Design a protein with these regions (language model features):
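Structured catalytic/nucleic-acid-binding cores of DNA maintenance enzymes
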Residues: 1-162
């Protein structure tokens, strides 16, 4: 994540306009809007679009892996090859995982203390992120994907559409 401070309204509004719709807070981020974003970038790899905050905001790296796993989509898919039914499932998984993570205080591999030294323990449960095997005993693959980030996925569960 990047934090950028601005000292005037114009710079703030310019930055805000460069960020895509937010899956957590934007009530206008319906499936139709999500699909329109995906269709606009249909020649691109799914992980590149999910992780590019100018297209869709709010998907952290751990969420990318969890969303793709939950929807059964390989991180190696080109968007145009993903069937409509799976695209709907991807949208639903994204909303579910983001809201779940938010409601549980986010996710962390470690405990931490906030600025008031209050200890926190994030409760979001990982299914594949930073795991060796999934709940079914399948090996979790950890690899750097086209978004230049580490992605955790399960070949037996996540389909590559061609």
């Amino acid at each position: 994540a990047t934090i950028r401070f601005v000292d005037n309204q114009k710079d703030f509004e310019t930055k805000l306009k460069s960020i895509g719709p937010d899956l957590l807070n934007d009530k206008n981020m319906t499936y139709q809007v999500f699909k329109k974003v995906m269709d606009k970038h249909k020649e691109k790899n799914i992980v590149k679009v999910l992780m590019d905050q100018k297209y869709i905001s709010g998907i952290a790296n751990y969420l990318k892996s969890e969303i793709l796993y939950h929807s059964g989509i390989s991180p190696h898919n080109i968007i145009k090859n993903i069937p409509e039914s799976k695209m709907k499932e991807l949208y639903q998984s994204a909303r579910l995982k983001i809201v779940s993570s938010y409601n549980k205080g986010g996710a962390s591999l470690r405990h931490y203390a906030d600025i008031e030294d209050k200890k926190g323990q994030f409760e979001f449960t990982f299914e594949v992120y930073n795991k060796k095997v999934d709940k079914n005993g399948y090996k979790v693959i950890a690899e750097d994907t086209l978004d230049k980030r580490r992605t955790y996925w399960v070949k037996e569960k996540q389909v590559l559409y061609e």
